[in-house]
Amino acid sequence: MAPKKTTKKGGPKKRPSAEKRIITSQKRCLINQSFKSKAKTMMKKFEAALKAGDQTSIASGLQLVYSVVDKAVKRGILKHNKAARIKSRATLRANAKI
């Protein structure tokens, strides 16, 4: 392993601000990707519940879709209007089956 860079006082060498932002944005990108994946998985489970036709699973699936989509908006992963579209379409599908 390469020796660690240190300052004159012996502490770790500080990074430039731009480097910190790059690292932070990479971390956030991974977190956002995993949350998007989770949201898509919940929507697929809801679609499977619709195909099965079980009313209780449809209702609980719809609640999960609402919850995950609202959290995505709060985190800034989805835009408000896209979330509204997703929820509206899910509700229409659920009402058609119930």
UniProtKB/Swiss-Prot annotation:
Transmembrane segments: none annotated. One of its GO terms (cellular component) is cytosol. Residues 1-21 are annotated as: Disordered. The keyword Nuclease does not apply. GO terms for biological process: translation. The keyword Transferase does not apply. Residues 1-15 have a biased composition (Basic residues). One of its GO terms (molecular function) is structural constituent of ribosome. Keywords: Ribonucleoprotein, Ribosomal protein, RNA-binding, rRNA-binding. It holds the Pfam family Ribosomal_S20p. Belongs to the bacterial ribosomal protein bS20 family. Binds directly to 16S ribosomal RNA. This is Small ribosomal subunit protein bS20. It comes from Chlamydia abortus (strain DSM 27085 / S26/3) (Chlamydophila abortus). The lineage of its organism: Bacteria, Pseudomonadati, Chlamydiota, Chlamydiia, Chlamydiales.
